[in-house]
């Protein structure tokens, strides 16, 4: 992996790009997007050559009232298929599953029954064991899997080191994400953290993703 590193001007075809407009934007409007907007966004991502499109969350309907949120809070299989059909395109479909807020055994079917390609597991530093369990379950179901550790700007150095070691060594996730949840990290901090993540990820044959804020 080290030979693939570059700088801001390097050509990096190995880097994959994910559009999170629906999932992240839905936090602002309670996921009340029209089907027309979602379809247009999907087609724009396909035309632009985007690698992944994240549709929203796999939220537990026992915790969140479906009457209070749009459909992309829950990402039912039939709703995604109404937009993408069989998704006969190079674009891959992603959903996010929050630790403690997703009923994985009820709401995440085997990949053979779903048009979704990737599940991104969102966790905080204090729920790493549950994140490992969810990541391994989703991997066993046939999905590509990431684990995103939220709010790392508030985590201590030692607990972050332990969390990364546990995730990298015990989870079946292919990717571990560096997430700046609050937009509070400066470039030099991101570089230092990225080096930390990459060092541990490479040790266990995993890759690193980043979700930044402006």
Question: Language-model features: where?
Answer:
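Short amphipathic alpha-helices and their capping/turn segments at secondary-structure boundaries
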Residues: 1-9, 38-47, 164-165
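N-terminal small/glycine-rich loop or linker at the start of catalytic domains
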Residues: 4-30, 90, 114, 144-150, ...
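Conserved, mostly hydrophobic/aromatic
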Residues: 25, 45, 119, 176
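Glycine-rich anion/phosphate-binding loops
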Residues: 30-40, 123-130
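Active-site glycine- and acidic-residue-rich loops that bind
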Residues: 32-35, 149-159, 184-188, 211-214
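Active-site beta->alpha loop and helix N-cap motifs at the rims of alpha/beta catalytic domains
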Residues: 46, 52, 57-166
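Conserved C-terminal portion of the radical SAM core fold
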Residues: 163-181, 203-204
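Catalytic alpha/beta core domains of metabolic enzymes, predominantly
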Residues: 179-214
């Amino acid at each position: 992996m080290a030979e693939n590193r570059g700088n801001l001007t390097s050509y990096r075809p190995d880097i994959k790009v994910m559009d999170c407009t629906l999932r992240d934007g839905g936090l602002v409007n309670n996921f009340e997007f029209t089907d027309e907007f979602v379809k247009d966004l999907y087609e724009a991502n396909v035309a632009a050559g985007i690698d992944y499109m994240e549709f929203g969350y796999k939220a537990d309907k026992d915790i969140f009232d479906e009457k209070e949120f749009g459909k992309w809070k829950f990402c039912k299989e039939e709703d995604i298929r109404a937009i993408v059909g069989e998704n006969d395109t190079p674009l891959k479909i992603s959903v996010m599953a929050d630790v403690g807020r997703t009923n994985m055994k009820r709401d995440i079917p085997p990949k053979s029954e779903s048009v979704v390609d990737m599940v991104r597991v969102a966790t905080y530093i204090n729920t790493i064991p549950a994140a490992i369990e969810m990541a391994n379950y989703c991997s066993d179901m046939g999905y590509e899997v990431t684990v995103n550790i939220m709010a790392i700007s508030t985590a201590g150095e030692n607990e972050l080191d332990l969390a990364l070691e546990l995730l990298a060594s015990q989870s079946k996730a292919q990717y571990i994400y560096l997430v700046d949840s609050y937009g509070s990290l400066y470039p030099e901090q991101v570089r230092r953290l990225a080096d930390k993540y990459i060092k541990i990820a490479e040790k266990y044959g995993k890759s690193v993703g980043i979700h930044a804020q402006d």
